């Protein structure tokens, strides 16, 4: 006996059988030991062969176990095993069978065959009693082998290769496991057309990720099962190849090729009855290629060219260009079928078809208006993904969120339960007290506790009953779905009596029960069970940060008072505040042009009048955070090439993978304020990039991705024409110099750029009367810095007037005032705090002197503590 002639699996079994014989204290190594390890094998090749040959595996296991138990045991032996004569004959028979079949190695099935044939071995009787005959087993082995010989030590791995490395889509379609495929008739028809060709009958579905390429393959499987295909495709099997399973565990060179050859051999020997579906087809190129080995695509080419292999591929446009088109020999063997993104209307139809499956899974109802909202909102607000995938995901997540709410405790019940817990803790504390007041309190508390516990029990029962009703409707939907699948199977098999019972008996009855259950659910209760457009809008807002969901009354009031809110921070610029507020209100009311940014403005005015401050105030108003904006300082973009910093470097340049400062910020957060500060400082060519942003609300970055700017508010600031605005009189309006200022602007920017901006807003130079208000705003900021120290500041009217007069300079706006306040107020205050003249918790009154401010400090903490 030469072990080199045996396959790896058989060698492993022989070793396991020896170990088992020693562990059972047997002295002889017999055929029963071999049969025992064969039928106990996890991968179950021997067990599968016995079943297919008409035998009972359970009977074999019982028979072999009984035989092993009856064997003599030798305690305290020398650990040696003796080969029994019957087993030697079994090995000899197995080697002869392998030689006769032209095999290079003795495989598991030949060993099993020898166990049935060798009459001197008890295993032949055990297998015969279980219903296995040598003739039946031989027939099954020939079916499994399909004419192939065992040429390698791992030959068993390649039996039933399609079962291991592919999924039968037609079997899934028959079992009703596939989602219905709605629409896509043209693409499926085109795929069938290519499959029906004589040669090169291999379509490849090419489209963006998420447009439904895999769904088309599933649609083809459903059509084959329903017989809705031409004669040439009737009763074909569509198998989805799993490239991951094919490559996984192929450790040695040649193992991957062997597996793939086994798959191809099975497909070829099926005489065109198997169509192979390869999802992510680009993975074929280079798959398994290592140390000079052939990759999968080269192994497939000959079979594809001869028409022996029927194949449907699917890949994205980018991957097809990157991998498949580079190999023209592979590309010419496939016929591209382009799959476009469906329209919003088609997406709604697709969602309607899938609705039942999602209702069944989440056990909630999904309204039709929610499906329409999912299609329209995803199309408008989720720019970097494709329909119908993004719309399906929205519906799925909205239903998941609602289900989570249904399973969570209602708010009213949660509040009562928390109150009960609080009272129970209080009761335990009061039990220790002996005074009358505590005893009275305990009696009252016990009474309240009883009432709350009754209320809690009542609400819990009501909530559980409503949940149960929802569960009943979900169960009925599941039963209805199963009944419809059963009806389809019965019609396909021609079992018309069963089909009639289902169509006119069971299905109408279930539909009636479901209608009644849904009518019960429809009544208002504690549990919300229908997914509405509001739920979908909430998910969109969570994904993108864009406020699409329904405005609450508080937000409406806030938007209507927007001018007043921003006016608290920006002084003397009513026209600018109003223009920006109107743009935001238009956007939130849904009346803005959906293909342009929310608004685009150029703020013109002298330095220090509040151009950048207005933008910060706007970001703070919309997002409660001054820094919630993209601020691009255009003074950094004075060279022509610096535009790459905005949109990202082109391919081949350093930093290509990093993306641009502007495009990446907006991609991550599509709803925000974008500020281009000091635009006149930038190189004129930089503005060419902004033309598409201002007109179409989109920009293509260095990597070719389209970034959506339709939900941004674009503000540009500039000092152009400031000299005209500074020289205006105290009571003169900016319209008096508008033409002169616009003349300077037109000389600096191209007409096509200015023509795309919504409005050019001129900022007034700050008047003397505005300065008092600015002093108050700056003073409030200083007060907020002292909150931690509990120091209270107060500034009298004369001090405000003194600071405003000292800090007023029409040419420089509010910035000189900031410097004056720093020098005259903050610096002396800091010194006094450090010297200990002003203590934490003091009240400081600031008054004006002839040439400086006076500080009077009065400690308040001590008094407060004494009172306490």
Curated annotation (Swiss-Prot):
Region annotated Repeat 2 sits at 83-147
Spell out the GO cellular component terms annotated for this protein, sorted alphabetically and separated by semicolons: cytoplasm
Region C-terminal, as annotated, extends over 766-868
Chain sites annotated for binding ATP 2: 605-612
GO-annotated biological processes: cellular response to heat; protein refolding
Classification via InterPro entries: AAA+_ATPase, ATPase_AAA_core, Chaperonin_ClpB, Clp_ATPase_C, Clp_N_dom_sf, Clp_R_dom, ClpA/B, ClpA/B_CS1
**NCBIfam families per record:** chaperone_ClpB (TIGR03346)
Q: How does it assemble?
A: Homohexamer. The oligomerization is ATP-dependent.
Annotated protein name in UniProt: Chaperone protein ClpB
